[in-house]
């Protein structure tokens, strides 16, 4: 069994009052729809025309990671789990000029969007990550459903009833019902030759072994393909975001970092891609997610201006430490928060959001563009093991949810998986996903382009 990494110590936290939860959730409600009169919404007893039952009791005064089992209700043709819901009344009760919501959708949305479960859970895997198996998404089977968006849709329905006005979802460009963020973590540029060469040697195919070595010495590596990756996304009118890993030495725990060094030649190639409209961001190495000095040193290596984007190598993230490190370093956006083990919604939300700072009781200033699907998730002995023809059919229901709510589909496809030799989660599967996104009218945007459409926290 691989070693399990312990969570960091639980730091002091600010009280999480009903007002705190309401403010955080209504802020994101106002970002998901245009011109939302959030002042109309309050908890029962405050005389607001739209009231939400306060069903969380003293849950948020404690540090338990998991609430009681959710109550499942039908909403918008979908079975949706509602936490903090006793289920004794209809979900939404409408009378002239008023609306009552019997489930505490504010507390439920706050619980999921803030990442409460992983902040207060001690569960971590060998990479220091909160494991999918420990999540409520896994326990109740809703990882591919953006549950928080359904909660906000309940609020939307109530507001429309009270005001008589239709709330329009956020738009991403002329005629674009949702957005797509296409990204590539640059872990390996020099190692395509290793697996076939080792296989030839083990099998005793000495001629093949010699040919593999000769090709390695005389030809560019098949994974040294940044320009080809950029061209592949450009076919769909998209720009890629390349997350660059600045450390080539393994982490202290032996986990590999990059197989390349940041040479002047590589920087020239990246600069040329940036001039073509592609984006360069930081892929912070092993050991940076819990060390500000290490992280900020790498930020300065890769990002030549204040701000910029980040995704941590191996999706490492310690919820009690990492958000504060990102915030202190002045990063503009992050795109780490997805489960390595399963595609879907780690925070049950298909829009970007401002992570919650438990120490201050308010939102951080940096922006999270959650990760929905990673190529390695789809075909890996440790994760899912989808067949070559099963990838797109498995993803379409999740992608359709993002389209339904006008969210952002974040795709991570490593450059090494553009190698034609990869038939499991390789270029064919990537092009199938891109074709679906383009066919549904997605606006392809870089991380900075997405961030620029949102106000600061």
Predicted feature descriptions by range:
Residues 1-260, 351, 358-457:
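Terminal accessory/targeting
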Residues 22, 26, 286-365, 411, ...:
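Catalytic domains of cell-wall/extracellular-matrix polysaccharide-remodeling enzymes
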Residues 188-192, 224-321, 343, 415:
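Metal-dependent polysaccharide deacetylase catalytic core of the NodB/CE4 family, i.e.
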Residues 199-202, 270-280, 310-318, 334-346, ...:
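Short, surface-exposed, charge-dense and proline/glycine-enriched linear segments
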Residues 277-289, 294-297, 301-302, 312-330, ...:
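Electropositive, surface-exposed helix/loop patches at the edges of structured domains
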């Amino acid at each position: 069994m691989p070693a399990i990494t312990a969570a960091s110590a639980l730091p002091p936290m600010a009280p999480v009052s009903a007002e705190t939860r309401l403010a955080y959730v209504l802020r994101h409600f106002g970002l998901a729809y245009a011109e939302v009169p959030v002042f109309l919404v309050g908890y029962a007893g405050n005389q607001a025309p739209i009231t939400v039952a306060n069903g969380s009791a003293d849950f948020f005064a404690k540090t338990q990671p998991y609430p009681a089992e959710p109550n499942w209700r039908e909403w918008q043709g979908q079975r949706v789990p509602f936490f903090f819901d006793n289920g004794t009344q209809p979900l939404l009760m409408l009378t002239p000029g008023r609306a009552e919501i019997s489930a505490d959708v504010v507390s439920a949305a706050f619980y999921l969007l803030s990442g409460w479960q992983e902040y207060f859970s001690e569960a971590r895997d060998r990479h220091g990550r909160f494991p999918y198996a420990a999540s409520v998404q896994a326990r109740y089977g809703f990882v591919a459903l953006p549950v928080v968006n359904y909660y906000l849709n309940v609020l939307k329905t109530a507001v429309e009833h009270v005001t008589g006005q239709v709330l329009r979802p956020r738009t991403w460009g002329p005629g674009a019902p949702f957005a797509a963020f296409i990204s590539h973590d640059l872990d390996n540029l020099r190692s395509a030759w290793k697996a076939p060469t080792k296989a030839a040697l083990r099998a005793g195919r000495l001629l093949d072994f010699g040919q593999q070595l000769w090709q390695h010495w005389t030809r560019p590596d098949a994974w040294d393909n940044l320009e080809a990756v950029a061209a592949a996304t450009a076919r769909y009118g998209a720009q890629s975001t390349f997350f660059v890993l600045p450390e080539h030495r393994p982490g202290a725990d032996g986990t590999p970092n990059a197989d390349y060094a940041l040479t002047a030649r590589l920087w020239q190639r990246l600069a040329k891609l940036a001039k073509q409209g592609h984006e360069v961001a930081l892929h912070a190495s092993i050991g940076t997610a819990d060390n500000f000095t290490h992280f900020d040193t790498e930020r300065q290596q890769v990002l030549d201006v204040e701000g910029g984007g980040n995704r941590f190598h191996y999706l490492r993230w310690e919820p009690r430490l990492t958000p504060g490190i990102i915030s202190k370093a002045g990063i503009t956006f992050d795109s780490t928060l997805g489960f390595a083990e399963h595609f879907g919604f780690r925070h049950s939300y298909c829009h970007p959001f401002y992570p919650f700072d438990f120490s201050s009781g308010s939102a951080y200033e940096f922006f999270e563009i959650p990760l929905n699907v990673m190529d390695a998730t789809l075909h890996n002995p440790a994760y899912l093991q989808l067949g070559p023809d099963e990838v797109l059919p498995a993803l379409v229901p999740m992608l359709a949810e993002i389209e339904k709510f006008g969210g952002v589909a974040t795709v991570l496809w490593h450059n090494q998986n553009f190698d034609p030799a990869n038939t499991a989660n390789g270029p064919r599967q990537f092009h199938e996903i891109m074709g679906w996104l383009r066919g549904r009218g997605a606006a392809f945007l870089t991380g900075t382009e997405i961030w620029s459409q949102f106000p600061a926290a």
